[in-house]
Amino acid sequence: MKDEHFECALRRDGFDDIERKNLPPGMRVPEHAHPFDIRALVLEGEIRLTVEGDEHAYREGDIFVMPAGHRHAEAVGPDGVDYLVGRRKTPALANDPLRT
């Protein structure tokens, strides 16, 4: 899917906060959760997400989703990663201080 089409689909589905992210090789983010849903399209490179002990790698052309409140860890591949991400606030979790 082309990034322009992906961005249109994000907006259609209520993912109003959209940005292109570029993360450096080897970057790691410890387990955390967000107060919003995430949908992302990998444009280049690789990112690995670990949820409940299961790790999955996403590469160019792959789409990943992360519902609000799901704890996960992130690990960027050896060449970094470039992806287009949309965030959709969820009313029940948007103001929950435990979901950061």
Question: What label would you give each PLM region?
Answer:
Residues D17-H34, A68:
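Conserved short histidine dyad/triad with adjacent acidic residue
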Residues P25, E44-R48, E55, K89-A92:
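Short, charged/polar surface micro-motifs in flexible loops or helix N-caps
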Residues E7, R28-H34, V51, A75-V76:
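Short histidine-centered beta-strand/loop micro-motifs
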